Amino acid sequence: SARRAFPCWDEPSYKATYSFRMLHSENTTALANMPSVRRRTARADDMQRLLHASPDLRGAWLMTEFDTTPRMSTYLVAWANGAFQHVSNTAASPLTGRKIPVSLYTTPEFIQQAAYTTDVMARVLAMYEKVFRIAYPLPKLDALVSADFDFGAMENWGLITGRTSVFLHDETMGLRGQKNAASVMSHEIARMWFGDIATMAWWDNLWLNE
C-alpha cells in the first residue's frame, strides 16, 4: 500500500508526479522509476534531517536524487536499494530515433542469467512502439529481479520488478524456460502502455492491464 510509504490518495484514477531522494550505503545501488540525476556523499546533517535522529552509521553513505516522474498512479511508484549488479542494452525507438537504455538488475549470484532477458527488453520495447504508434515516454527502462519477490512480476513504470524464477534464463532451463522468460517480460513491458500510460479508473477494469 502506497499509504504506508507517503501521504496519498492510493487509487488508480488519481495521478501525480513524484520526486525521490534516497540515503544509502555507498556499496549499494539505488533505483527508482526515473534515472538518478545527482549523487553525492551524504553529510551528517542530511542523516539527521532525513532520519530525525543522529545515527551512528558506519562507512560512507550517499544521497541519490532521482528525476521527477510524469503524472502516474501511486500503485506504479517503485524504489529499491541493494547490492545489485546489472546487464544493460539499448532499445532504438522506431518513432523518434531515441536510444533508450534498458537494464536488468539482480543479485550477484544470478547476474550470469540476465543477458537473454535484457536482450528481450530492448527488442520488445522497440517493437511495441511500432505496434502502438506511441513512443515510450520515460528516459530508461529497468527491471529488478529478486529471489524473494512476493509476486510473479509487477509493471512499475520504468522499474519492472519480479522473481528470478520467471524473468531469468540460463541454458539448463531449455526452450520452455526461455519462452517463459520472454513471455513474462513482454507482458510486463506491454503494461508500460496498457496500465501505466493509459490507466483504468478503478480496479474493476483491471482487464486493461492484462
Annotated model-derived regions:
Residues 2, 7-186, 203, 210:
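Hydrophobic helix-coil surface modules that form long, contiguous segments used
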Residues 189-205:
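Catalytic Zn2+-binding segment of zinc metalloproteases
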